[in-house]
Amino acid sequence: MYTSLQSARAFCYRVASDCDQGTVSRKDTASCLMFASESAVKVSLEAIQTLGGNGYINDYPAGRLLRDAKLYDIGAGTNEIRRMLIGRELFEDTLPD
């Protein structure tokens, strides 16, 4: 779980740095959003699994973390839309000039 979160954080920081320098592409930002949201859902599901039945009750924040993480999958464009955008950008990069 730790590795997944740190990987997403490092990727987001790199894309943010590229934005600051003005060298960012749409595929990088879409990839960053997609990877971070999928990592968040995966980690929150693992947290619920680790807690067992307690993961579903409101005494632990794992349930809320999952709901919040899932919102990133569907909010501001779904990950399927992001995949299509990334594929389109990669295809355009391979076309001869």
Regions from the PLM with identified roles:
Residues 1-97:
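Alpha-helical interface subdomain recognition
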